[in-house]
Amino acid sequence: MQVLQGAEARAALTRTFSQIPVPDAVLSRIEQTFGERLTPEQVVERILLDVRARGDDALRDWTERLDGPRPAELEVPAAELEAAQVAPELHAAIRLAAERVRAFYRQQPAHGFLEHGPDGALGQLVRPLGRVGVYVPGGLAPLISTLMHTAVPAQVAGVPDIVVTTPPGKDGQVHPAILVAARELGLSRVFKVGGAQAIAALAYGTASVPAVDKIAGPGNLFVVIAKRLVYGQTGIESLPGPTETLVVADDSASPRYVAADLLAQAEHNGAEPVLVSVSRELLLAVQAELNEQLENLPEPNRSWARDSVGARMKVVLADSLDEALDLANLYAPEHLCLLTRDPWSLLGQVRRAGGVFVGEASMEALGDYVAGPSHVMPTGGTARFMSPVNVRDFQNIISVVGVNEETLRRIGPAAATLARAEGLEAHARAVESRLK
């Protein structure tokens, strides 16, 4: 285990904001699928253009080519949605998670204001978006939590129309847990479409899939590229990349808990776990725990986690907790876990993070599911300037200007002066026409 310190640690935790590396396996699959060497961007551009031109037919073709059987119908029938069942324990967990996420976001201030005073009326109107598309990744398992952690804030924001897209399984069907979660949230439109083709459908619309005002939800490299390319045609909430967790720990932390929290994220494909501690003894103890816990993980989780730990994990020895928090802010992690003797005393020093998990009872894995805040958080250092999914992501703010004539006469001449300074004579004359 290489332990970084000082300038070496700062250099390792400074983001370069380079493109996400493309694994050789992805490039090989692209060549097998398309019969030529293409970049992921070229693949996505081809899919977007095709869906925009051919609509539902293109969706069926790409789904058959990339995901499995050709879908006869793109939308999950209402009867299938109503009939979906899961084990009672899972259904109860879905219900609890939805309730807690909804309760959390109902506390977020999301109202406008309109002040009537001597100047007239000035204010802001807050209006929900008309239609939102929620993308739920498929892949190896149904990401039930992503649906709840994305759709519920949109519902609390007042969005009247929410549609869901998710890749079908190899049997051509949407996993029943996704359908149960959608039903629990009162969502009635779920489409069996994934990948870049789903993003294209939500952005441009097809005969079956309605175009939306904003697309929300994480996805693989192709989904992220597609969201970036359709931005402007529709809105996007973020461009989430591989997950990351930075743990700040002192000598009071349990090596078992620290290792468990690091591995909880390391089992995600491409994850980057980071440990910053003021105790060399803890670092050594965590290394031993990581080895033991890795061996006890089932496959394929063990291989995924071992890859993340071996290829991307960073271990830092800080001189003080102040330095540890400074390094955390430099890194701007998606998840920041504080496992120290007095974690609440450090909260005031946190300036850049998607989410902060305070104390050993508040493990990040809890936040992934039932704590309350959305787990869709900024990655890749974008927590410097972006926020987790929240109610404001699904609302418009409209400025209201309603000054009276007395105020116009007082401030209008200044407006005309500024307009002429900018070379905009018609602006100045529009103001002066009301002053005569």
From Swiss-Prot:
It is an enzyme of class 1 (oxidoreductase). GO terms for cellular component: cytoplasm; cytosol. It comes from the Bacteria. Pathway: Amino-acid biosynthesis; L-histidine biosynthesis; L-histidine from 5-phospho-alpha-D-ribose 1-diphosphate: step 9/9. Substrate binds at T243, Q265, H268, H335, D368, E422, H427. The keyword Metal-binding applies. Keywords: Amino-acid biosynthesis, Histidine biosynthesis, Metal-binding, NAD, Oxidoreductase, Zinc. Its EC number is 1.1.1.23. This is Histidinol dehydrogenase.
